[in-house]
A protein has these predicted regions:
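A structural signal for small-residue-enriched, beta-sheet-centric alpha/beta enzyme cores
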Residues: 1-101
Length: 101
């Protein structure tokens, strides 16, 4: 989860005090569940060192993809006396093409 903010940065996000950017990570894997009230230490498997960097890269890519998907699927929204228009996907394509993206 700590690496997800780097994926946000790839999309142009900036950070400031109170910006509210955070990431949460959890597992639903049955074999990793901890019994409530457990008092014993249970050893957990660890990734080999050479697998950590590819995992971090996957986190960045997944976060970046999630941001892009949310921008492209957003709808025009009105609230608090303001209206924010949804992105025009065709116009975005033209801009991206213009800049070789």
């Amino acid at each position: 989860a700590a690496r997800a903010v780097f994926g946000l940065a790839r999309t142009g996000s900036s950070y400031s005090n109170g910006s509210g950017d955070f990431a949460i990570a959890f597992s639903t894997a049955k074999e990793l569940r901890v019994t409530h009230g457990a008092t014993t230490i249970t050893p957990r498997p660890a990734l080999p060192t050479e697998a950590v960097s590819p995992l971090f890269e996957a986190v960045l890519e997944a976060t970046e993809e999630a941001v892009i998907n949310s921008l492209l699927k957003a709808e025009t929204t009105t609230g608090n006396g303001r209206t924010v228009q949804a992105l025009d996907i065709e116009k975005l394509r033209e801009i991206l093409k213009k800049y070789g993206r």
